[in-house]
């Protein structure tokens, strides 16, 4: 098998990871509901900005409390043509009230060549 050098051309595959912080566990029900609504709005803004959601995954069926085995419980997979969409997404959460309750990280990769090649 020949392993070709990967391209770094759009669309970019982006994995957004979200986890609750200590603030989430100390928040009231109303604060959690507001944070959840705001997270949804922030993620929809990314789609309005050009991110194409491929899949979402919430790892809460067999886990309660702060995530320990993996540091995140919410995963959203996007394709984006412009990485500025991702920068705006991260900055939007960073500058919102949601940052008191949730943390977000984005990773840029590509489709797995042995499956999508």
Regions found by a protein language model. Give the residues of each.
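A common structural junction motif
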Residues: 93-103
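Short, glycine/charged-enriched secondary-structure capping and boundary segments
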Residues: 31, 91-92
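Short S/T/G/P-rich N-terminal loop/turn motif that feeds into the first structured element of a domain
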Residues: 1-72, 80-83, 110-117
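Short amphipathic alpha-helices within nucleic acid-binding modules
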Residues: 83-91
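A generic structural motif
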Residues: 102-111
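Conserved, mostly hydrophobic/aromatic
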Residues: 76
